[in-house]
């Protein structure tokens, strides 16, 4: 095997080892390793299960710690082993082994790049589960159909990422599509991945609802907010709430069950409205709606404190030209993020949930 190729493999392994060592420092590998041992010992104590809430918190912490510790441990072992094997194979002129190591470096590079990407999740709630609210805006029936396309897009994206999803509320459009929907997303860094999707999404296409085949523009808004767990105290005065019950009006099928026990809660001081209709039990729907409300109130307060409420709340209330984050021009095969200038021509792939190019660019640019 030529010397240039051998040197390239050696340099790649050295570069990956250096980046992995940097990750161990950035991600506090030593501290997390020690804490993982402590958590394991605590979970091995039978008395911890007398306090289910504490046991649950420890279980979540263990899972989070293992994600970093086990991945970095294996990466270090793989890189060290590959470097040692490479030197032996090079001395013996074993081209077959060297080619296998060269192939393995691609997988190790992908792991390093993924962990470097996850370093961008520095927000206090990035690791949390989240909710996605979808609201049809300007454009009538076309906008309702667009909202249903976005619902499908995000469900497909979450499926690709291995996230668990549940459609909590889905209101049908008068002719087609949906007026609104709320999704709960459960998975590691669900909010971190999805938070930059908040904003208005614009669709331009030849409308299937126009017999003349005219080109139509419509809008739908996306609002993503983290689920607040019991460790964060959110006080809600019952006097500030209006609770309405109604018959579910969703599209049915695989997403949602028709019930007579849907719940809508309005927080009067802020005007925040949450709805849940996925369960046949009114009690469970109300409990889920309260979780959504507390999460919304937490996010609302955070945005106020960070002086970012203007842009975010405008995106919720003014679903029109002025607050777009992404433009989907289907008849020109072009989807463009207006914040990062990332542009994709394979529109169907994006609508089928391949949002990673947009999300990664927005996180890297600190959108």
From Swiss-Prot:
Residue list for modification N5-methylglutamine: 254
A single cellular component GO annotation: cytoplasm
Transferase as UniProt keyword: no
Cell compartments where the protein resides: Cytoplasm
GO terms, molecular function: translation release factor activity, codon specific
SMART domains documented for this protein: PCRF
UniProt keyword terms in alphabetical order: Cytoplasm, Methylation, Protein biosynthesis
PTM text: Methylated by PrmC. Methylation increases the termination efficiency of RF2.
Pfam families (alphabetical): PCRF (PF03462), RF-1 (PF00472)
Keyword Protein biosynthesis: yes
InterPro entries cross-referenced by the UniProt entry: PCRF, Pep_chain_release_fac_I, Pep_chain_release_fac_I_sf, PrfB
Function text: Peptide chain release factor 2 directs the termination of translation in response to the peptide chain termination codons UGA and UAA.
Family: Belongs to the prokaryotic/mitochondrial release factor family.
Family matches, as NCBIfam families: prfB
Protein name from the UniProt record: Peptide chain release factor 2
Gene transcribed to yield this protein: prfB
């Amino acid at each position: 095997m030529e010397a240039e190729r051998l040197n390239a493999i050696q340099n790649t392994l050295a570069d990956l080892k250096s980046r992995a060592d940097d990750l161990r420092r950035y991600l506090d590998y030593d501290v997390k390793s020690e804490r993982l041992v402590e958590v394991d010992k605590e979970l091995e104590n039978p008395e911890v299960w007398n306090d289910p809430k504490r046991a649950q918190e420890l279980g979540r912490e263990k899972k989070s710690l293992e994600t970093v510790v086990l991945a970095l441990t294996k990466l270090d072992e793989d890189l060290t082993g590959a470097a040692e094997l490479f030197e032996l194979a090079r001395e013996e002129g074993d081209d077959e082994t060297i080619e296998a190591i060269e192939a393995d470096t691609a997988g190790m590079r992908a792991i390093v790049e993924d962990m470097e990407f996850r370093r961008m999740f520095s927000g206090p709630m990035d690791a949390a589960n989240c909710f996605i609210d979808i609201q049809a805006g300007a454009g009538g029936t076309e906008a309702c159909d667009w909202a249903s396309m976005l619902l499908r897009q995000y469900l497909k994206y979450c499926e690709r990422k291995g996230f668990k999803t549940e459609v909590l509320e889905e209101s049908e459009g008068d002719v087609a599509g949906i007026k609104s929907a709320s999704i709960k997303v459960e998975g590691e860094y669900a909010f971190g991945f999805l938070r930059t999707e908040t904003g208005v999404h614009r669709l331009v296409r030849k409308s299937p609802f126009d017999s003349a085949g005219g080109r139509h523009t419509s809008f739908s808004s996306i609002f993503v907010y983290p689920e607040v767990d019991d460790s964060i105290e959110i006080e809600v005065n019952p006097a500030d709430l209006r609770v309405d019950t109604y018959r579910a009006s969703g599209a049915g099928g695989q997403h949602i069950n028709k019930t007579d026990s849907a719940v809508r809660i309005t927080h009067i001081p802020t005007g925040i409205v949450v709805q849940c209709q996925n369960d046949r039990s009114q009690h469970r729907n109300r409990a889920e709606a309260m979780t959504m409300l507390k999460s919304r109130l937490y996010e609302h307060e955070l945005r106020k404190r960070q002086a970012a409420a203007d842009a975010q709340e405008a995106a919720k209330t003014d679903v029109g030209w002025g607050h777009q984050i992404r433009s989907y021009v289907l008849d020109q095969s072009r989807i463009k993020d207006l914040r990062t200038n990332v542009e994709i021509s394979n529109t169907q792939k994006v609508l089928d949930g391949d949002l990673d190019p947009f999300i990664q660019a927005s996180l890297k640019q600190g959108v």
